[in-house]
Amino acid sequence: YDRSMLASLVYPVANPTFPYQMAKGYYPRIGEGKLNGRVTRLLVSPLLIALKKVVGDRDYLDYLRSFRYPLSGEFALRTQTLPDLRIPSDWGLEIGVLSEAWRNLAPQSVCQVEISDAYDHKHQDLSEEDASKGLSRMSTDICKAIFRKLASDGTVFTPNLFRTLKATYYRQALDLLESYYNDATMNG
């Protein structure tokens, strides 16, 4: 991180004339000539689309979809908001913080801030052999955070709903893969 990233992130909540209680950072996930952000692109985006199709319109799902990079871990909060937030300690942290902001703050008090045009960070291994590590664990924790929030708002998750969600997610993921491929082809 450099000072300008921190300043960009903190400014909206530090400026007393702004109404923001939370600022969520975002940045392009491009590095070494490839598109990164696998979990956002291949899990979160198609899952949120599939959930909307399966469980119907939920303002919470629209809220999560409104974030350009919902899994960025960079966020700033006004100190008076902290006591009301239950912040997860697993890979569901980013979704959990957004969920807590949804629960405790007015939507217009949350903003998004571009904090860098090129920022890259440590990438996790797929960890296909060990579901308790890497992207496997990350994906599980993120899904749990989303499902728990929806369940706490009254969505009932049954085995049939999960089967339908799985099929719908798969279709949405394939459609997005085609879109990502086309985007990569157009942009070299």
Locations of the language-model features?
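Conserved nucleotide-sugar donor-binding
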Residues: 45-55, 66-85
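A short, flexible beta-alpha/helix-coil linker loop
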Residues: 28-32, 82-83, 118-121
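Conserved glycosyltransferase catalytic-site signature
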Residues: 70, 91-99
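Active-site donor/metal-binding and catalytic loop motifs
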Residues: 111-132
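Terminal low-complexity segments of carbohydrate-biosynthetic enzymes
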Residues: 125-188
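Conserved donor-nucleotide/metal-binding helix-loop-beta segment in metal-dependent transferases, i.e.
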Residues: 1-29
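A recurrent flexible, glycine/aromatic-enriched loop bordering the glycosyltransferase active site
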Residues: 29-38, 55-74
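Catalytic donor-sugar/metal-binding loop of nucleotide-sugar-dependent glycosyltransferases
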Residues: 18, 89, 99-118
